[in-house]
Amino acid sequence: MALLASIYALRIAGLFLILPVFALFAGELAGHTPLLIGLALGAYGLTQALLQIPFGWLSDHYGRKPVIAGGLLLFALGSVIAATASHIGIMILGRAVQGAGAIAAAIMATVADLTREEQRAKAMAAVGMTIGGTFVLSLVVGPLLHGLIGVPGIFWLTGALAIVAIGALYRFLPTPVRVAAGRRDLRRDFGRILRNRQLLALDAGIFVLHLVMTAMFVVLPLIIVRELGLAGADHWAIYLPVMLVGFLAMVPFLVLANRRHRHRAVMAGAIAVLALAQLLLVFGQQSLYGLVIGLTLFFAAFSLLEAQLPSLVSRLAPAANKGAAIGVYSSAQFLGAFAGGTLGGLLHGVAGFDAVFWMAAGMLVLWLVLVLTLPEPQLLASHQINVGNQSPGQAARLAERLSRVPGVAEAVVVAEEGMAYLKIDARVLDKKHLEQFGSSV
């Protein structure tokens, strides 16, 4: 899982490394306005959002590795365009091409494919925490790299690392078994996902989370320069302590959610903390203490939700549509980044810094209300059975019989693989009955 986490971190770093310095750098590009700066920051998210679902579906049907490698190539190309941009329009193009390599869904689905159910929640949380860890490093390393090689140098660096990652992908990563059958159609796959209310609530949540985060960083670097007088290369001195404290503070709450099955309560608490952080940034931005406390609360809650949400999506997703479900989730995540950059830039240009934080607080309150109206998620376990060679007709009949076993909520039999993929409620599962159909994997 370390390699997948590293590739995911590289892709996320393409967004996060420039977050703390991009607003400062983009002000030097020809043709810039606050709105276009925000659009350039969020353009990465728009193409990610448009292509996550197709890439997730393709990874279900044609394999994870080719999709991941193709996405890394697009990311490298976009990095070259952004590195050589002298006009804000070219920068927007480069960021859009970077985002076209929409591999987050394929990576998360591969993690699910390569881990057993009893370890899957931990693996998903670990990859989710990689985002938080990348966030920590990016906000510290980004300003330092800005001082050493500039923002263009950061783009060159991440593009080169993407090429290295392709070689590592084929050299070291096992090829996962493809779960989805090639005969299923796109409309049916995504119809099942889009009718699931709990999955849609998680999609809405990750949209708001990344909208808020990206909008904040349209104005936050400018506030630090204006109010604290810190040059861009020195912003790491603010981010390092608050990120470390925030990251460590979230761990006990993540453990509580998983061990005590208090997912909704922990999520609601984290959202409330995010909203409080926005208010502190409105009223306390003129002082070092106000900024530090607000940012610490924000990063603690952000890291917690980034670790919690993808694990919930994987466990709630239909058995044979993990790539599709995570594709919808990832699309919402990156669409939020695009919306946040665009709205942040627009509000900054029209109404100033405070308007951005008030907008973010309002969005978070709406998310909190949504979470409080939903029941505690009913998380099912995944289970695989080796059922031997099956014709398509036999596979369909076997899936129907398996679905009637007490405790089996869903059954998908892939004839060409000789495998049955189940969603089960372990508390009521009739294990002896299930063993009659084949050996568990």
Protein language model regions, located:
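C-terminal membrane-cytosol helix-exit motif in multi-pass small-molecule transporters
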Residues: A160-R178, W367-P375
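Helix-to-loop junctions at the C-terminal end of transmembrane segments
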Residues: Q52-G63, A249-R262, H348
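Cytoplasmic helix-loop-helix junction between adjacent transmembrane helices
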Residues: G94-I131
